[in-house]
Amino acid sequence: VADREDVDGIVITHGTDTMEETAYFLDLTVHTIKPVVLTGSMRPATAISADGPLNLLEAVQAASWPDLGKYGVVIVMNSTVHSARFVEKTDTTHADTFKGRQMGCLGYMQDGRPRLYQQPLRKHTWSSDLAAPKELPAVAIVYAYVGLTADDVRRLAQGKAGLVITGLGHGKMPELVWQALQPLMEQGLVVVRAARALGGMVTQVPAYDGTVTADSLTPQKAKILLQLALAHTTDREKIQAIFDAY
């Protein structure tokens, strides 16, 4: 659709539960300068003050603004414009559920057009070198917690090309889990360390040499980027370079 000459912008209606994941996948794989906007609703059409109609109207208005494509794929909800990379669903029921907790929003919808105040610097859409393969490599997310065992992780790693560890603090994990992962990594398993904390980033530390770090990506977005990276290469250093660029 993005390649059609009669299409100036794209609006996708989507359920809110996984909207941020679809938005980020498209942000990495749709190579276009045209606006791509996702939107949805938190309240049903039968509810008093349903949010769907206004969200859809403002999504279309946003997609009609040609310069929006420079910002990558966005989510427009509750009169707010969010970058696909940073947006998260933060509340189970509230209409203002989508937040850019790390870096804030890109801007707001006002008077029928987006008014934007910052621009993503990481690679996306028209600057992305990643492409969607016919089949994505298998990657699982492991949530670290008190009591997580090595056997739990070994089971989850079976048949997987990569694991994303939703780590404690700065991407840490129980020592026995780390010991169990090292031989799997030697066999080719790629391990990405993300954080279960709501802010901050995960960076390299000597204690977890050989892992890839997710920087400020949420675990679910780190999984998407790892799948696309593994479709291109299995070299850990090259995968880290991809995470540093996107």
Feature map (PLM): residue ranges:
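Short acidic, glycine-rich surface-loop motifs adjacent to enzyme active sites
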Residues: 4-19, 159-170
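Short coil/turn connectors at secondary-structure junctions
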Residues: 5-9, 31-36, 68-72, 77-78, ...
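Short Gly/Thr/Asp-enriched flexible loops that form oxyanion-binding sites at enzyme active sites
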Residues: 12-34, 173-182
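Short, ordered loop/turn segments at secondary-structure junctions
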Residues: 15-16, 41-44, 168-170, 195-200
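Internal gly/pro-rich beta-alpha loop/helix module
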Residues: 38-110
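Accessory alpha-helical/coil subdomains and C-terminal extensions
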Residues: 83-170
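C-terminal non-catalytic interaction/assembly regions of soluble proteins
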Residues: 170-246
